[in-house]
Amino acid sequence: MSAKGKTGRKKASKGTSNSAKAGLQFPVGRIGRYLKKGKYAKRVGAGAPVYLAAVLEYLCAEILELAGNAARDNKKSRITPRHIQLAVRNDEELNKFLAGVTFASGGVLPNIHNVLLPKKSQLKAGTANQDY
């Protein structure tokens, strides 16, 4: 009795994705497909989707970290568009990068114009020295 057909054959293993090879969470294959489909250039290099996925992942991680800090400052456990707006607008580089972007349900930054604030000299002398 011989083990027919069982010698030398290895079990078929699942292939690893390009994202896993690059150590990324963002889909390298999908980004590559979008680059080809979008007709941005005649040809797309093998490293271009990997690089773009890494850049997008870094930007998302940066924004989510700052938005998480904003949510924690407001004693909330869920990140809302308001927290993302506060995070982006309070960071100088992200604000410059996303200057033309409007966040839905983001609100506005809290800001009171200096002219509308009471003067400090009036606060000290105003209550003690009133002439009728």
Swiss-Prot record:
Protein name, entry field:
Histone H2A
* Positions of the UniProt region annotated as Disordered: 1-21
Spell out the Basic residues composition-biased ranges.
1-13
Q: Please report which protein family the annotation says this sequence is part of.
A: Belongs to the histone H2A family.
- Share what the entry says about its subunit structure, partners included: The nucleosome is a histone octamer containing two molecules each of H2A, H2B, H3 and H4 assembled in one H3-H4 heterotetramer and two H2A-H2B heterodimers. The octamer wraps approximately 147 bp of DNA.
What CDD domains does the database record attribute to this sequence? HFD_H2A
- Primary localisation category: nucleus
Q: Which Pfam family name is an example for this entry? A: Histone
Look up keyword Metal-binding and say if it applies.
no
A GO MF annotation of the entry reads:
DNA binding
What is the stated purpose of this protein?
Answer: Core component of nucleosome. Nucleosomes wrap and compact DNA into chromatin, limiting DNA accessibility to the cellular machineries which require DNA as a template. Histones thereby play a central role in transcription regulation, DNA repair, DNA replication and chromosomal stability. DNA accessibility is regulated via a complex set of post-translational modifications of histones, also called histone code, and nucleosome remodeling.
Q: Which UniProt keywords apply?
A: Chromosome, DNA-binding, Nucleosome core, Nucleus
Can you list the GO cellular component terms from the UniProt entry?
Answer: nucleosome; nucleus
- Localization terms from the record: Nucleus; Chromosome
